[in-house]
Amino acid sequence: MIQTLTDLSALRALVNGWKREGLRVALVPTMGNLHAGHYSLVMLARQYADRVVSSVFVNPTQFGPNEDFARYPRTPEADLRGLEDAGCDALWLPDVDTMYPLGTALATPIHAPGVSDVLEGECRPGHFDGVCTVVARLFNQVQPDVAAFGKKDYQQLAVIRQMVADLAFPIEILGGSIVREADGLAMSSRNQYLSAEDRPISSTIRKVLLQMRDSYAAGTPRAQVEDAASHTLEQAGFRVDYAVVRLPDLSEPGDSHAGARVALIAARLGNTRLIDNLEF
C-alpha cells in the first residue's frame, strides 16, 4: 500500500531506510490533478529504481500574477488512487511552509540562464525560476537517485537537465514520452479548462506539429514553416504565443536542415493555454 507523508523527517527516515537496504529511489514531481501521462512517469521511474516517490505540490512561485494558481485543479483522492495503481510507493505532500520555510519572498531563487530565457521564458517571465527553485528543494528533500519528467514540457525538461548538470546533483533525469488523447491532444491537467466547443479544435495543435515536421523535412525554409503553422492555428481560432522549429537545445538552427530538430507550439484556445512539441 502507498504511504502518504506530510512530515519531512518522516520522509527522510523512509528514504534513508530504503537506501540502507541498497535500494534505488526515484522521484516523480507533480502538481496533482493527475492523468495517464503522470502515471506513465511513475511506471517509467519504476524501470530505473526499486522505490518510487511522487510529490504533489501546487507551487506558487511558478505561477505568474495573472495565471491560474488559485483555480488550478486539486484532486487528492483520485491522485492517491491513481498513484497506487501505477505502482508508486510513497506520496510526498509538503505544504507551503515546508517547501518555503522562510516564506516565498525570501526563497533562495535558482535561475538556469539561456535555456530559461527563451520561448516559455519570454511568455511567462520567472516561471522557470519557480520551477528550478521547487525542483531543487524536492531533490534536497527526497534525495532521489532518479527523477522523471514528461517531455510534453520539453523546455522544462531542458531547464532541469541544465540545472542538474550545473549544480552537480547526483540524479539521473528521465524524460517520459508524451501521452495523448485518441485525437492526438497531449494530455494535460489544464485540458479540463477547454469548453465543449473548443475541445475538438484543440487537437489541431498535433496536426500542425506533424505538418511542421513534414514541411521542414521537405526543405521548406524554417521561417516559412513557422509562419504557415501560426497562420493555420490562428485560422482555427488559436492565439499563438509561438510556433517554432529549434535544435534540441532550443537554440535556433541555421540554414541546414540536417540533424535533429524539435517543433514547439504554445497557443491559447479560449481561456486555455496549451503547449505541445514534436521531436524529429
Swiss-Prot record:
InterPro entries hit by this protein: Pantoate_ligase, Pantoate_ligase_C, Rossmann-like_a/b/a_fold
Binding site residues for ATP: 31-38, 150-153, 179, 187-190
Catalysed transformations (reactions): (R)-pantoate + beta-alanine + ATP = (R)-pantothenate + AMP + diphosphate + H(+)
Record GO cellular component, one term: cytosol
Entry keyword Ligase: yes
Active-site residues per Swiss-Prot or TrEMBL entry: H38 (proton donor)
UniProt GO molecular function: ATP binding; pantoate-beta-alanine ligase activity
Keyword Transcription belongs to the record: no
SUPFAM superfamilies attached to this UniProt entry: Nucleotidylyl transferase
Sequence positions that bind (R)-pantoate: Q62, Q156
Keywords: ATP-binding, Cytoplasm, Ligase, Nucleotide-binding, Pantothenate biosynthesis
Chief location category: cytoplasm
Localization per record: Cytoplasm
Assembly mode: Homodimer.
Family in the record: Belongs to the pantothenate synthetase family.
Protein's recorded name: Pantothenate synthetase
Protein species of origin: Xanthomonas axonopodis pv. citri (strain 306)
